């Protein structure tokens, strides 16, 4: 442990990683760097995978190290101070709920978290018979709750329009824009809109890169880059007319997968800040101590969660086996834990090119429990059926021994109903697993215990804190569930050969960020120039060896649209570059390989191949 640590930590956070050293993958922002800890993620077995991802998650709580690059961390004084400053401004909104609003906005996982958080704090207010004053925006609208709609993320104008719409008639709006990578144009558009109307709006940006690492290419069809917007926002900091909350939490265990640490850190940071603001309303002043007290409960949650590592590894192994046999993972959650399950399932589609049926989430009460703005979306198609009734009616009849069913609940939920569902599922598959949250002193009834072969049991301490105490426990359970599911699904897809080293190599290129990520992964794995990598990526997207002038002159948005109808775009480009073979040859090689990973691995060892940058740097 380092001597510089200021706080007594609940968990043992790892020592600073090599990624903090100057020059480490210098051209990449932290959120896109490859984590040195997980370089051999693809070779790990389930227990090692859990351990590696556990250590990556622990980096969220690591402190700033003055001997290294001066990255601000969650516990840095400047970050705690900004959290306190924003909390005080939230308090002002809470005092005048009629013409004020707190808007939380994000894309993908960040948008789903905006929904979860807005509902939590509206629930907190309603419980006190106060007016709800939170609202959420997610790019792509409510359909993005259950499906991935990554392309709307690229539209800054749309972001601004949506914001204007939800704030109509309000005199005081605190806007919280979440973009883990400081990258989403949708959020840039909203921040820019706020900065043009500072009489009404207070813009707050949440993400996990320094401003100097925010995305720097000019947004297509717009006037600025994300970085320029963030820099403008930074200048408002001293006058308290705008804030940026961007502690470094380290690179993701799976490079670029911001749903993981980025999502967890968003939840930790914002829930802490908002809870303190609500406490402060009851005349408790906003202090660093209040913030630290809550942050520590999340550290404790990390410890409690990963005390179940063995069982998490078993669930991961079971899930990987199901997926390998063309089976499924069905996640059935109660209350907000159901939403956490849906969040995790949805992201498997863009991150691993999974079919939407492979991993699915269901929630008790369906849309009614989610409390989304657009109400019941189930008429939009089978993908949008998310209630337990939908599962029983439409999915259960075809469940078989190859499928895994995971139930997630707390001991305060309807245990009779759970027991009945367990019995129904057991008629179809013996692969039934449970994540069960209890408060100290509560026990799972024997009747349930006997029927479920494998239980991940998490017991949370009783928190003797006024009304908010119950919310802290809810937040801990949600985060703990998120950590387990992130680890299980990322690990299962790693075991299925969807990861090479720690790079996602088979993701959907459905927005500009992902287009750039694809080129960057190509460069890192092959050591070839940016220009050459872009060329081969385009060959793979269009399935043409010779690129026409028209293709070369197409915008990135156009390439993204073309990529939408193709599968395995990135793996085909990687193998084609490594083997100097045609796109067609590469595709047939991949199609006849055991996995994407094995196709890349065998291409790495082709005689005479030029060594890649990654090879020489660290292997
Ligand atoms: C937004 C996001 C992620 C998702 C995927 C694509 O990222 O939709 O939530 O996991 O990586 O991007 P960000 O704007 O929060 O960085």
Curated annotation (Swiss-Prot):
Keto-D-fructose 6-phosphate binds at residues 107-109, 179-183, 347, 513. It is found in: Nucleus; Cytoplasm; Mitochondrion. Interacts (fructose 6-phosphate bound form) with gck. The keyword Ligase does not apply. Fructose 1-phosphate and fructose 6-phosphate compete for the same binding site. Residues 462-464 are annotated as: Essential for interaction with GCK. It comes from the Eukaryota. It comes from Xenopus laevis (African clawed frog). The keyword Cell wall biogenesis/degradation does not apply. InterPro entries: GKRP_SIS_2, Glucokinase_regulatory_CS, MURQ/GCKR, SIS_dom, SIS_dom_sf. This is Glucokinase regulatory protein. Regulates glucokinase (gck) by forming an inactive complex with this enzyme. The affinity of gckr for gck is modulated by fructose metabolites: gckr with bound fructose 6-phosphate has increased affinity for gck, while gckr with bound fructose 1-phosphate has strongly decreased affinity for gck and does not inhibit gck activity. Keywords: Carbohydrate metabolism, Cytoplasm, Mitochondrion, Nucleus, Repeat. GO terms for molecular function: carbohydrate binding; enzyme binding; fructose-6-phosphate binding; glucose sensor activity; kinase inhibitor activity. Residues 90-283, 319-498 form the SIS domain. GO terms for biological process: carbohydrate derivative metabolic process; intracellular glucose homeostasis; negative regulation of glucokinase activity; protein localization to nucleus; response to fructose. SUPFAM superfamilies: SIS domain. Belongs to the GCKR family. Beta-D-fructose 1-phosphate binds at residues 109-110, 153, 179-181, 347, 513. The gene is gckr. GO terms for cellular component: cytoplasm; cytosol; mitochondrion; nucleoplasm. Its main location: nucleus.
């Amino acid at each position: 442990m380092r001597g510089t640590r200021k706080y007594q930590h609940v968990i043992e956070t790892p020592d600073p990683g090599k990624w903090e050293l100057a020059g480490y993958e210098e051209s990449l922002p932290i959120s896109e760097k490859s984590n040195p800890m997980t370089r051999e993620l693809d070779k790990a077995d389930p227990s090692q995978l859990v351990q590696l991802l556990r250590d990556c998650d622990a980096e969220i709580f690591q402190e700033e190290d003055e001997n290294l690059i001066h990255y601000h961390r969650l516990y840095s004084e400047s970050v705690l101070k900004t959290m306190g400053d924003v909390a005080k401004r939230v308090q002002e909104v809470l005092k005048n709920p009629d013409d004020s609003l707190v808007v939380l906005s994000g894309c993908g996982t960040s948008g789903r978290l905006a929904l979860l958080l807005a509902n939590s704090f509206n629930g907190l207010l309603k419980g006190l018979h106060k007016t709800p004053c939170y609202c959420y925006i997610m790019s792509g609208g409510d359909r993005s709750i259950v499906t991935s709609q990554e392309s709307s993320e690229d539209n800054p104008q749309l972001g601004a329009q949506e914001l204007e719409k939800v704030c109509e008639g309000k005199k005081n709006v605190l806007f919280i824009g979440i973009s883990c990578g400081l990258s989403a144009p949708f959020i840039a558009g909203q921040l820019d809109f706020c900065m043009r109307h500072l009489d009404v709006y207070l813009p707050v940006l949440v993400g996990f890169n320094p401003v100097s690492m925010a995305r720097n290419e000019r947004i297509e069809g717009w006037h600025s880059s994300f970085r320029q917007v963030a820099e403008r926002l930074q200048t408002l900091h001293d006058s308290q007319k705008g804030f940026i909350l961007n502690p470094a939490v380290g690179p993701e265990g799976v490079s670029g997968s911001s749903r993981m640490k980025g999502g967890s850190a968003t939840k930790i940071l914002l829930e802490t800040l908002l809870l303190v603001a609500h406490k402060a309303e009851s005349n408790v002043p906003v202090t660093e101590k209040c913030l630290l007290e809550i942050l520590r409960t999340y550290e404790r949650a990390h410890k409690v969660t990963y005390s179940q590592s063995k069982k998490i590894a078993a669930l991961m192994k079971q899930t990987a086996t199901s997926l390998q046999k063309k089976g499924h993972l069905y996640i059935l959650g109660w209350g907000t834990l159901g939403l956490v399950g849906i969040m995790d399932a949805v992201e498997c589609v863009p991150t691993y090119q999974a079919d939407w049926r492979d991993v699915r989430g269901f929630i008790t009460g369906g849309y009614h429990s989610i409390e989304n703005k657009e109400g019941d979306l189930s008429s939009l198609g089978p993908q949008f059926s998310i209630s337990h009734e939908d599962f029983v009616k439409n999915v259960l009849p075809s469940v078989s021994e190859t499928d895994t069913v995971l139930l997630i609940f707390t001991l305060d939920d309807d245990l009779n109903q759970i027991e009945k569902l367990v019995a129904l599922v057991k008629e179809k598959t013996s692969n039934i697993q449970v994540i069960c949250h209890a408060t100290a002193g509560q026990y799972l009834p024997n009747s349930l215990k006997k029927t479920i072969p494998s239980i991940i049991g998490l017991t949370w301490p009783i928190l003797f804190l006024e009304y908010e105490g119950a919310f802290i426990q809810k937040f801990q359970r949600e985060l703990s569930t998120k950590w387990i599911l992130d680890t299980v699904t990322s690990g299962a897809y790693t075991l299925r050969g969807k990861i090479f080293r720690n790079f996602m190599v088979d993701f959907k290129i459905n927005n500009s960020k992902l287009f750039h990520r694809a080129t960057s992964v190509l460069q890192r794995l092959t050591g070839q120039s940016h220009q050459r990598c872009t060329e081969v990526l385009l060959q793979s997207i269009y399935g043409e060896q010779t690129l026409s002038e028209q293709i070369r002159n197409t915008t990135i948005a156009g390439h993204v649209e073309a990529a939408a109808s193709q599968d395995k775009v990135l793996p085909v480009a990687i193998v084609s570059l490594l083997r100097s073979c045609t796109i067609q040859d590469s595709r047939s090689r991949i199609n006849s390989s055991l996995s994407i990973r094995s196709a890349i691995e065998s291409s790495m060892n082709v005689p005479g191949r030029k060594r890649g940058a990654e090879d020489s740097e660290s292997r």
